[in-house]
Amino acid sequence: MLGSLVLVWVAACLVLFVWPPAEGSAPAHADAVVVLSGNKRRLPPALALIRRGVAPVLALSTVQRTRHWPQAARLCAAHRYAGARVVCFTAVPFSTRGEARTVAGLALERGWRSIVVVTSTFHVTRARMLFKRCYRGPLTVLGSSSTWWELPKEWASETGKLLVQLSVERGC
């Protein structure tokens, strides 16, 4: 019985966190590329999108920018990257829900009608759910890969957080 439950959980984790339902690739144009805080590996794919000219704005959730994320600190200090404006924000509360709420507010305030959110692949399912609850415009959520040794911890954490979002905290 326990073995069956573990097998079902692993299968669900593979579907939700390793190979989440794809939205395709990044759109040809968006008003902003948003990088969620929490992992330095999220920044390079976002920078590649900016270099390709996908969006004129790079928005960084920067609670970790000082000591843990020096590249983000440099981008925030420069205010520009590859011709794009860099907007740095700190979500309140510091959570994916807080980031979704903050970005929805920034989108209204700054006239962003479409956004691309870059996060870790394991986080795509929950981030997409929360951003769709808070942000009303066209949305693409893309994932950056994680190292294999981080996956068990990420799966356990995301499983709990996803269950909370599905059962208890159902709004924006």
Predicted regions and their residues:
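A transmembrane-helix-recognition feature enriched in membrane-embedded lipid enzymes
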Residues: L151-G171
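A structural signal for short, hydrophobic/glycine-enriched beta-strand patches
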Residues: V18-A156
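Hydrophobic membrane-insertion alpha-helices, especially the h-region
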Residues: M1-L16
